[in-house]
């Protein structure tokens, strides 16, 4: 039997869901312009790196910690994690891009669901106490729907992999079949990533690959662009 709570959460993974993810490459466009990423194989290598670094030690670990804080009704911990996610995201474009996507996701979630936590998170932004991050909002929504944290992380990783793959299909370019082949190959890697996220200590929050951050910073100066970040 289909779990409708899971389907409701999966709605937010749809590539047509208007969070603005289609406008952000999170540094991928810099790699493409330098011809470091130029085909199916090189893009998948980049995607695995992004998954195993930024989506693991920033978004993914934060989601696990936020879920625990929600269960403990620890608002201070959630605001601290929101702040850490914002300030440790050094490249300006990716920092602002995440904030923009978080704002859109929170507003859409508020329209669709009457969640005390999401309404509270939105209010914290209005009071300038939170920046709003999509990873935190997604976790709050999954928690509201009664979905376990492992599944919430699975869906969030899938949403990012799917969105970035569609952006690569446009930018490299790749064929749609190649894009689906990449997503198919990434599914077992996503499971490994989620399993790793569930074991790493909170002290490792924010670890990332310098090369990713440098290329995200340098995207500000690319001559021709189709993405905001």
Swiss-Prot record:
Annotated coiled-coil segments of the chain: none
Species of provenance: Staphylococcus saprophyticus subsp. saprophyticus (strain ATCC 15305 / DSM 20229 / NCIMB 8711 / NCTC 7292 / S-41)
Role summary: Required for maturation of urease via the functional incorporation of the urease nickel metallocenter.
Family: Belongs to the UreF family.
PANTHER family for the chain: UREASE ACCESSORY PROTEIN F (PTHR33620:SF1)
Disulfide bond residue pairs: none
Keyword Chaperone recorded: yes
GO MF, one example: nickel cation binding
Keyword annotations from UniProtKB, A to Z: Chaperone, Cytoplasm, Nickel insertion
GO cellular component, one term: cytoplasm
Xref: Pfam families: UreF
InterPro entries: UreF (IPR002639), UreF_sf (IPR038277)
Localization per Swiss-Prot or TrEMBL: Cytoplasm
Name of the protein in its database record: Urease accessory protein UreF
Keyword flag Chaperone: yes
Subunit structure: UreD, UreF and UreG form a complex that acts as a GTP-hydrolysis-dependent molecular chaperone, activating the urease apoprotein by helping to assemble the nickel containing metallocenter of UreC. The UreE protein probably delivers the nickel.
């Amino acid at each position: 039997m289909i779990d409708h709570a899971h389907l409701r959460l999966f709605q937010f993974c749809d590539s047509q869901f208007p969070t603005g993810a289609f406008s952000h490459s999170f540094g991928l466009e810099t790699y493409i312009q330098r011809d470091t990423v130029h085909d199916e194989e090189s893009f998948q290598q980049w995607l695995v790196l992004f998954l195993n670094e930024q989506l693991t030690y920033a978004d993914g670990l934060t989601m696990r910690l936020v879920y625990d804080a929600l269960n403990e009704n620890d608002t201070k911990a959630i605001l601290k994690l929101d702040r850490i996610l914002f300030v440790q995201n050094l490249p300006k474009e990716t920092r602002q891009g995440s904030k923009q996507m978080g704002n859109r996701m929170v507003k859409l979630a508020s329209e669709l669901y009457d969640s005390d936590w999401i309404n509270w998170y939105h209010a914290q932004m209005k009071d300038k106490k939170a920046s709003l991050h999509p990873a935190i909002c997604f976790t709050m929504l999954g928690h509201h729907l009664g979905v376990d944290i492992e599944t919430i992380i699975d869906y969030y990783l899938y949403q990012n992999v799917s969105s970035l793959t569609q952006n690569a299909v446009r930018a490299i370019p790749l064929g749609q079949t190649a894009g689906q082949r990449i997503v198919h190959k990434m599914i077992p890697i996503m499971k490994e990533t989620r399993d790793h996220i569930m074991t790493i200590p909170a002290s490792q929050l924010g670890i990332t690959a310098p090369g990713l951050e440098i290329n995200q910073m340098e995207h500000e100066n690319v001559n021709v662009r189709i993405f905001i970040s």
